Amino acid sequence: MKDDNKILKLIYTFFLGLLLAIFIGIGTNTFYESPTAPTYPIEVKNNNGELTDGQTALQVTYENKMETYNNKTITVYNRNVSIITLSAATILLVLSLLLKKKKIKIITDGVMLGGLFTLIYSLIIGFSAQDNNYSFIAATVGLIVVLYLGYHRFVRQQK
């Protein structure tokens, strides 16, 4: 019977962490909406034969807008989302250290796991920003936060 309780606590902790990461991801998308991609011109869509000069101009304009969208707009958006979620992950991980003092182990572990899942999400989004400098900084911050958390949660606890 006691083993069933341990399994249930483990599942609850994992589920809480997963829900926190999902909450932060959806919250970020809700309050910081992604940019809208350019729409393909209808005049070019309905063409059955060769493109006219006007349609060619529309096609070139659309391709230029898509290039700007893919190379600049969405890259900046992904970097900003990564910054927001990295901050949220750090807050969750610090909160898990503070909750540890309250002796609420199952909640503390769930919050810590949520922070780690959010950190992973943040790094993945950061990599899609295609900025090596930012990716390196984000990975460094993540590493420092995880090392600090690990020390305070596991090493310092044993002393």
Where are these regions (language model features)?
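Membrane-interface helix-boundary signature
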Residues: 5-11, 75-78, 101-104, 108
